[in-house]
Amino acid sequence: MIIKNSEFIISAVRPSQYPVDNRVEMAFVGRSNAGKSSLINVITNRRKLAKTSSTPGKTRQINFFLINNEFYFVDLPGYGFAKVSKSEQQKWGSMMEQYLINRHQLKKIVLLVDSRHKPSKEDVQMYEWIKYYGYETIIVATKSDKLRKNDFQKNRKIIKETLNIRDEDKFMFFSSLNKSGKEELLEILSEGIFEEDTME
C-alpha cells in the first residue's frame, strides 16, 4: 500500500461525533507512550499528522485520520497511565470500549507494545479482549531501534508467549526512528481490507 494523502478529520469523545461514511477503519491501541502517534506519522509520511508528546496520556480522544480518501486510521487513547485519576482512566476505557464493540467498520486492530519490555498486565488484557470480539490483530513491537541485535529473538519469544499470540495474528518489530518495519506494516494493513465490503 502506498499512502498518497492523509487528513485529520476529527477528535471524538462520543459515538455521535464519529464519521458516518462507513469507510473501513483500522485502529491503533496500546499503553500510553507506546508510540501510536509516532507510528501513524511515519507510515503516513506526515511528521505532525498525529500529535506526539513526551508526556504519556496525550491522546485523550479518539482521533480519526482519512487515508487516501478511502479508509480511516483511528488513534485510540492510551491505557495504563498511572498518573491520572481513576475516574479519568475509567472514562478513557469506556470511550475505547464503546468504539471497539459497536464499530462494524472496524476491520483490523494494531496492538502496540514496547519491544524492550515484557508486555504488561494491561497489554495482555487488551489482547484477550480484542480476540474475544474476533478482530484481526497485528502486534507491533515498537522502539526496536533500542534493541541490541541479539535481543530480537529473545524479546520476540517473551512477547509472543506473554500475550499468547494466536497463530492467525501477525507479529512484527517497528521503529519510528529508523522506520524499520514501515513497509511490512503497510503491506499487512492493506491485505484484504476491501474484500468483505466488495462481497457484500
Curated annotation (Swiss-Prot):
GO biological process, alphabetically ordered: division septum assembly
Cofactor(s) the record lists: Mg(2+)
InterPro entries, A to Z: G_ENGB_dom (IPR030393), GTP-bd (IPR006073), GTP-bd_ribosome_bio_YsxC (IPR019987), P-loop_NTPase (IPR027417)
CDD domains: YihA_EngB
Domain EngB-type G: 22-195
Record's keyword terms, sorted: Cell cycle, Cell division, GTP-binding, Magnesium, Metal-binding, Nucleotide-binding, Septation
Ranges annotated as spanning the membrane: none
Superkingdom of this protein's organism: Bacteria
Residues reported to bind GTP: 30-37, 57-61, 75-78, 142-145, 174-176
GO CC terms of this entry: cytosol
Record-listed Mg(2+) binding positions: S37, T59
GO molecular function: GTP binding; metal ion binding
Alphabetical list of NCBIfam families matching this protein: GTPase_YsxC
Similarity comment: family membership: Belongs to the TRAFAC class TrmE-Era-EngA-EngB-Septin-like GTPase superfamily. EngB GTPase family.
Function: Necessary for normal cell division and for the maintenance of normal septation.
UniProt-recorded name of the protein: Probable GTP-binding protein EngB
The organism of origin for this protein: Clostridium novyi (strain NT)
